[in-house]
Structures are given as structure tokens and as C-alpha cells.
Amino acid sequence: DATFVPYSIFRDVQRGSSLPWHKDYTRPALLDFFLPARDSHAAAYYDWGTEKETQWKENYRLWMAFVNEYKNRGGRVTAGADSGYMYNLYGFGYIQELELLREAGFHPMEVIQSATLNAAEAIGMNDLIGTIEVGKLADMILMDQNPLKNLKYLYGTGDIKLNETNEVVRVGGVNYTIKDGIIYDARQLLEDVKKIVDEEKEATPNWESLMIQSIDR
């Protein structure tokens, strides 16, 4: 489990703190927790700049090369996000991790395998989950786009592109999640999260300043 995503913000703090989903899906309390702090390991970017980001980019180059070579030599790599700090948001952070595996040199199918079969094998449950086969649990996601073409389609908010009439449209996103035989409307679940965040915003008068502090650093 390479878990690239938690420290990836150190490569570009301004970008990581202003990712588009934070406005709608990150609770104010979590935004406050994400702000720079001298006494917090999870918010150590209180004096950050180009030199440190350049060092971290080189660190990631070496780290990714190692993980990719480990995979190429037969090592099993799984995907994990360790979300909850440094602007690494639950759900969204996991898809960021898949994109980082792709950046490391994994083929898109190897990325998907890291998140499915490899993970199931690592915990000794590949007889029940990890692949779609007769007799296995039907734990899966359903979507109308191909993530092998663009892993960003796996984000709850999908991705944007120009359509045939030159209009900007949003495509992708998971439509349904099936877990333990229960079908969940993934888009409705995401809307439920937004409502929870909106309710906390109403009870947090300074939430906009937290968002501004996240972006204007």
C-alpha cells in the first residue's frame, strides 16, 4: 500500500488546499483542522514555498519509481488513502491515490487491479471479493464512463470536458454502489453529504473565512 496521497499536498499546497470538492463536501470543522499549525504533524505546511515543494516533487519521483519497479518485479501493490488530514478528503482522496499510481507508471488496468483484486488478496478475501465472478459477493460500482480512459470519472463529481457542440459539460461519477446486495444511489449519497456540510456551514458563521484561508496561503 504505497499511500501516496496523504503527503502529495506537499508538492503543491495551494493546489491541494483549493481542490474543487472542498467547498461542497468538506465540513467546516475539518477545514479548520486542515489549516497550518506548528504543533500538528498533519498540518506542517505553515511556512511552505517553492523550495520545499521542489524537494517533495523529487522525493515523489524517487518514491514512485521504487513502487513501480517493485510492482514490475512481481510485488503486490494495493491502493489506500489514509484520509482525514492534509486536505485528503474521504472518498475523493482514494481516487487521487489511483491517479498517483497512474503517475507512478502503472497501466490503468494495473491501477484498478491494485484497488480490487490485489487488495482482496492482501487481506485473504479474494475468494469472496476482488473480481466479478459467479459465487463471489456482488460488491461493485456502476457508472456510464470508462475509468480506464480517465480515472477522474471515478470522482463523485466526475470530470469536465467539451462536448460536440463546444459546451463545457460534466461527465462521469459513480451512478450506483452495490454493497452486501444493497443498491445505493451514489449521486444521492453525495447529495446527502452536501446537505450535512451545508447544515454545519449554517451553524459555523466563519466557514467562508476557513475556505479563504485554505486558498489564500
Description of each model-found segment:
Residues 137-194:
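C-terminal cap of metal-dependent C-N hydrolases
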Residues 1-104, 197-217:
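Active-site neighborhoods of metal-dependent hydrolases
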Residues 79, 85-142, 171:
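Extended hydrophobic/aromatic segments used for targeting, binding, or gating
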Residues 111, 127-130, 139-144, 153, ...:
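C-terminal or late-domain output modules
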